[in-house]
Amino acid sequence: MFSPLRIVSLNRVSNVTGLITPMSPINCLVHEEGALICWDCATAGSHEAPLMNNTAVNSLDYCDACFFSPHKMVGAVGSPGLLIMKKKLFLNETPNMPGGGTIFYVSEGLHRYTQVLTEREEGGTPNILGAIRCGLALHLHNHLGWDWIQRREEEYYQQTMEVLRQHPNIVILEDDTDCPKTSVFSILIKYHGYRIGVEMT
C-alpha cells in the first residue's frame, strides 16, 4: 500500500516575538511518526548556528531540511537563501528547474542530466557574488563565536526593552512566559488615526 508523504514545516524562531521553538523533541516526534521535518530558520539563522544533526543523543534528532536567509547576517546583504537537505531526499532524476549546467550529455535523440546534486539543482548562472558574501558572513560569525554573539545580543536586547517599555506610546508584542527567545521583537505605536489623516491632508 502506498504511504503518503507527510511533511512538517515549522519556524525555529518567531519573527514577531523572538520565541524559540525547541527542535530536538519535535524532530524526534515527527520522525517517530514517519514524517519529514523541515525547519524555517530564516529568522534564527543570524542568531544561532544551524544544527542539522543532533544524533549523538537520539538517532531521530535531525532535520530533513533547513532553510534560512543569510542576508539577515552582518555583511551578507544580497546573498541568496540557503536550502540544506538530506541527500536521501533528492530522488528526482530531472532537476526541479532544468537550465545551464544541469545537462551532462545531449545528442539528437536523448539527453542526460548530471548526477552531481549541487549542479543538477542549480540551473543557470549562480549568484556568485552573493554566495561569496554568504560565505564571508558565516566565516565572520564562526570567527566571533555564536556564544559571544548571543551574549552581546542579549545585552542590547535588555537595554532596548528597558527604554521601549518606558515609552507611553509604544506597545511591545511580547510573550510574558519564560520560554527561550532571541533578540527579535515587534512594536506597535499608539497614534490616533484621525490625527494622521489630518496631518496628511
Residue ranges of model-derived segments:
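Pyridoxal 5′-phosphate
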Residues: 1-201
